[in-house]
Design a protein with these regions (language model features):
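Macrodomain-like recognition of ADP-ribose-binding/processing modules
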Residues: 1-228
Length: 228
């Protein structure tokens, strides 16, 4: 089920070394207050949680994942995989995420939100970016429900824009869709989140590159999406 919620005070930092991704974010999030956009490495972001666009097995062996593992130490992959085993029987579906202690001061937490099932998978023709982004923010909800106020800020890279081959503007628009869904609704379970996004598959897929789609939960007896 979904429940309406008031706008979150969560600080969101979008940060990437790819200048085209950064410019695409600036276009997609131009009218969104409270978003910090940086042309910089995720590893320099001073926040409570980093989002790692991992794969379903939690293997941190390439791209952003590998950089995070080098920075935080090999133990971070073990923590992520332990959480995946305990909470998802060893395979974390796209549209789900886990939040684990990082073992560091900055960030205190790492959120693993897969954009692909296996390493180096091309996800450019999927909605995996929207699913992963929305799932990452739902993980913030869950962590703050367990420990209120423990995640007040979060940093994300361009999900799927490197290894996943998602075009930067498409990536930015899908991340906008995932972020606005987080602000509008709190999902009680991941299946509900996935069903909500996938029910609006046509709207998201058919939107031109410069047009964003605001996802809304399915109405009783149907579904809806608004274009922005």
């Amino acid at each position: 089920m979904t429940t309406d919620r008031t706008p979150s005070p969560l600080k969101v930092v979008l940060t990437d070394l790819n200048a085209t991704v950064v410019e695409s974010w600036r276009a997609a999030f131009a009218d969104v207050p409270g978003i910090e956009i940086r042309h910089a490495s995720l590893l320099t972001a001073k926040v409570d949680a980093w989002v790692s666009p991992t794969n379903s097995r939690g293997r941190m062996d390439g791209g952003t994942d590998a950089a995070i593992k080098r920075h935080l130490g090999a133990g971070i992959q073990l923590r992520v995989q332990k959480a995946i085993r305990e909470q998802h029987a060893g395979s974390l579906p796209v549209g789900s995420a886990v939040c684990v202690p990082s073992g560091a001061v900055n960030p205190a937490f790492l959120i693993a939100a897969p954009t692909m099932r296996t390493s180096s998978q091309n996800v450019s023709e999927t909605l995996n970016v929207a699913l992963a982004c929305a799932a990452a923010f739902q993980a913030v909800h869950r962590q703050n429900r367990l420990r209120p106020g423990s995640v007040r800020s979060v940093a994300l890279v361009g999900l799927g824009a490197a290894t996943g081959k998602v075009p930067p503007r498409v990536c930015a628009n899908l991340m906008w869709s995932g972020y606005t869904l987080f602000n509008d609704h709190h999902f009680e379970d991941d299946d509900d989140l996935r069903a909500t996004v996938l029910a609006q598959l046509d709207d998201l897929e058919k939107a031109p590159p410069t047009q964003r789609v605001r996802i809304t939960p399915p109405a009783r007896g149907g579904s809806a999406a608004r274009r922005a």
